[in-house]
Amino acid sequence: MLLRRVMKHVRDQNWFAVALDFMIVILGVFIGLQVNTWNAERQVRAGEQRYLERLREDVAVSIEQNEWRVAFMDRQDKYSTLALNRLSSCVVPPEDRDVVANAFFHVGKSLPPVLLRGVINELNATGNFQTIRNSALREAITKAIETIETSDLIFNNVLMRGTPHVVYVESQLEYLKSGPRSGAVDIAWRDIAFDLDALCADQGFRRALSAARAYTNDMQNHVTVALEQQHALLQIIDAELAK
């Protein structure tokens, strides 16, 4: 219909009408392209929103796990410190016995920081990392990953250096309770046997317990750093989702 109208205007030599027809065509094409562009951008933004929501969930779970790890290692530091004090005096009051038993039971237990990377790995694998427009957010994600990878290397080193001390401490103990047991669950004084007088006189035992505590504290520091980064990352994500 439009073509017939243009041809009629040409035959009539109505050049103004011809120009107007062409402007209508050009404007229609432009609007069509613009609508397609807007639709594509809206789809990209919707995809970014979904990624951010899933990423937020991963980071929130990571924070929860790391907070537990910090608390666990902080508790172990307190247990070990009290146990070392009691070994120095060679007296363990009844109210401290379970704490001392758990200082020995949990000796050297440390955990590296964690970051759930399901969404991050998906973004990298699909080439959609740039879908996240906020460069500060992309940088925060990259730094969080680098911290985890560095901490994993340090954890392996700490584990290797701390193992001889842990082995020595445990060689002086006898566990009386059999059966499966979670490594994070406390035991009772009655679940473990040792010669208190011998341990008090054994300077090597105290040094091994102290060294294991130091290595656990080292990993606790790395988890704390990662935790602070992840809290900051979560704030950036929340700010993006609020836009």
Role assignments for model-derived ranges:
Residues L20-Q34:
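Hydrophobic membrane-insertion alpha-helices, especially the h-region
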Residues M1-F16, F30, T37-K243:
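Long, hydrophobic alpha-helical segments that serve as membrane-spanning/inserting helices
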